[in-house]
Amino acid sequence: MNSMIRYAAGAAACLFLAVAAGQDVYRRQISLFLPAAFLLPGLFCCLWRLAMEGEDLYMEAAALLPGCGLCLLAGLSDGKVGWGDGLCTLILGLLAGAGPCIFAVSAGLLLLSLLCVFLLALRKADRNSRMPFLPFLAAGYILYLLFD
């Protein structure tokens, strides 16, 4: 049963990230309805890991740190980092847990950095160019699923 819940949580996270990435690419903003719709399943997954799998409370709190950090950056950076990126990372932390969330954020930032360096080298972008983060977060989560 535990593995079935894990697969359902992974599928929910993939669906969530796919829709959020599409909104981020095409609309350059995330509908507030999307994170709100996945908040309840995320809380269920978090409580399931705490109650049934014996996950440590500190690990569940650590799953929220990347999202909290991005929300803090969104508030401090005058829109350079979007609030939707932080909210979606918080929901990913609730759905997937600390390890997958931290891996996805790290891999997503690495992939985004590589693309930015490539575009800067080709002079297709400058330091003020805006890039959507959520497609790279989704790619980072898919990489986690492939390597897990």
Q: Could you tell me what each predicted segment is?
A:
Residues 1-148:
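A membrane-topology feature that recognizes alpha-helical transmembrane segments
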